[in-house]
UniProtKB/Swiss-Prot annotation:
Family, similarity comment: Belongs to the lyase 1 family. Argininosuccinate lyase subfamily.
Pfam families in the record: ASL_C2, Lyase_1
PROSITE patterns tied to this protein: FUMARATE_LYASES
Enzyme Commission code(s) on record: 4.3.2.1
A GO MF label: argininosuccinate lyase activity
GO BP annotation list: arginine biosynthetic process via ornithine; L-arginine biosynthetic process
InterPro entries, alphabetized: Arg_succ_lyase_C, Argininosuccinate_lyase, Fumarase/histidase_N, Fumarate_lyase_CS, Fumarate_lyase_fam, Fumarate_lyase_N, L-Aspartase-like
Protein name: Argininosuccinate lyase
């Protein structure tokens, strides 16, 4: 049997828990990251206890000095959990009592429960973690924008269904990956509005009768407000699920970018060469240069999705208020943050060092009759209904395929035989440069529009950086 030494509960029990239960309950192996937040909250709690008349000035100052000493020892690693500590809260109370004595140290627990404590600490940790992740995402956006700026006129095959579709600018394609990542950062910034509500003062579920001031603690800990409902405050983990979703969405967006890089780096595509520092080799095949970062990004997206779905499954059928199931709420979120903090700098480095073969992309851009839409739209500009123009352009593709030539190589007689308006003048649009230049509406792939898109991406990233700092 465990002795229950150092536990925050036990007066009602004659003996400690069974060893198997103690092992099952233990959480210091993952919740110790909350220790600095726990100490900061304890300092705020000591001040509120003093304001409520529950501590003398000397007692408050003694607790604050003990907590400062404990914080220093936690930071340098000289204080750490013992095998007998159940969780971060119990370990830190033990550390405080070691420094100020049981009589004074035991006063700090008045008016608070692990239920409101951990809900507050989780929110505080996550608010900081989200900012770190957002910075990493913006690093990837910056790498994409830099590559786009370096290739303002490079043309590549645009694809749908992974089949050649229409010519587009490489910069246009790269910025198409930047936009969803910017939306992810916007979601992270918006998430803070809901995370910045402090559960502190809710107690186990019913609030406190000791005259404590939840708003004062909320303000000291950097929250926007205290919770309006103590039951909801201790039981709610929708903030964690929301964060897990955005983290998973980042993983999905990175995975799509990674998939493009994986394809582009193959011999068959040949669009990019990977930098030696951001790729790996094979243990048996000397020629290999493998896109490991991109493949790990693709693989880790599944892990992030799993963390989200696992958390939602944990939350789905819990009655109000707090249940011990919620011990399982933190590890998936902690893991998602940790994985992205590893992954994002690597993806940014990979993207920033890609070497593009722009000649190869330009050579492939017209293949697969990617200018057929330009033929149809040229006919529309001459007054032909689009339905008819679409049929005529398709017939031109069939004729070119039958001869094994490009659309621009069809004879004038062949063109007019398909449709009387389809004359040799159509060749003026049958270049990849003419195709991309013609698509100059907002959002299009014309160079003038893509230059505007690049400015939008950079301006949006700057605004989001500023928003995340406030």
């Amino acid at each position: 049997m465990s002795t229950n030494e150092g536990s925050l509960w036990g007066g009602r029990f004659a003996d400690g828990p069974a060893d198997a239960l103690a092992a099952l309950s233990k959480s210091t192996h993952f919740d110790w990251v909350l220790a600095p937040y726990d100490i900061a909250a304890s300092k705020a709690h000591a001040r509120v206890l003093f304001s409520a008349g529950l501590l003398t000035e000397d007692q408050r100052d003694g607790l604050l000095a003990g907590l400062d000493s404990l914080a220093s020892d936690v930071a340098d690693g000289s204080f750490a959990p013992l095998v007998t500590d159940e969780d971060v809260h119990g370990a830190l109370e033990r550390g405080l009592i070691d420094r100020v004595g049981a009589e004074l140290g035991g006063r700090l627990r008045a008016g608070r429960s692990r239920n409101d404590q951990v809900a507050t600490l989780f929110r505080a940790w996550l608010r900081d973690a989200i900012r770190r992740v957002a910075d990493g995402v913006l690093g990837v956006v910056s790498a994409l924008a830099t590559q786009a700026a370096a290739h303002p006129t490079a043309i590549m095959p645009g694809k749908t269904h992974l089949q050649s579709a229409q010519p587009v600018l490489l910069a246009h394609h790269l910025l198409a990956h930047a936009h969803p990542l910017l939306r992810d950062v916007d979601r992270l910034a918006d998430f803070d509005k809901r995370a910045a509500v402090s559960p502190y003062g809710a107690g186990a579920l019913a609030g406190s009768s000791l005259g404590l001031d939840p708003d004062a603690i909320a303000a000291e800990l950097g929250f926007d407000s205290a919770a309006d409902n103590s039951i909801d405050a201790t039981a709610a983990r929708d903030f964690a699920a929301e964060a897990a979703f955005v983290l998973a969405m980042i993983g999905v967006d990175l995975s799509r970018l990674a998939e493009d890089i994986i394809l582009w780096s193959t011999t068959e595509f040949g669009y990019v060469t990977l930098h030696d520092a951001w790729s790996t080799g094979s243990s048996i095949m000397p020629q290999k240069k493998n896109p490991d970062i991109a493949e790990l990004a693709r693989g880790k997206s599944g892990r992030l999705i799993g963390n989200l779905t696992g958390l939602l499954a944990t939350l789905k059928a819990q009655p109000l208020a707090y249940n011990r199931d919620l011990q399982e709420d933190k590890e998936p979120v902690f893991d998602s943050v940790a994985q992205l903090e590893l992954l994002l700098p690597a993806v940014a480095g990979l993207v920033s060092t890609l070497s593009f073969d722009v000649d190869r992309m330009a050579e492939l851009a017209p293949l697969g009759y990617t200018l057929a839409t330009d033929v149809a739209e040229w006919l529309v500009r001459r007054g032909v209904p689009f339905r008819v123009a679409h049929e005529a352009a398709g017939a031109a593709v069939r004729a070119a395929e039958a001869r094994g030539v490009g659309l621009e190589d069809l004879e004038d007689a062949e063109l007019t035989g398909i449709h009387p308006e389809l004359t040799g003048d159509v060749r003026e649009v049958l270049t990849i440069e003419g195709s991309v230049n013609s698509r100059d509406a907002r959002g299009g792939t014309a160079p003038v529009q893509v230059a505007k898109q690049l400015n939008v991406v950079r301006d949006t990233a700057d605004r989001l950086r500023l928003r995340l700092r406030t």
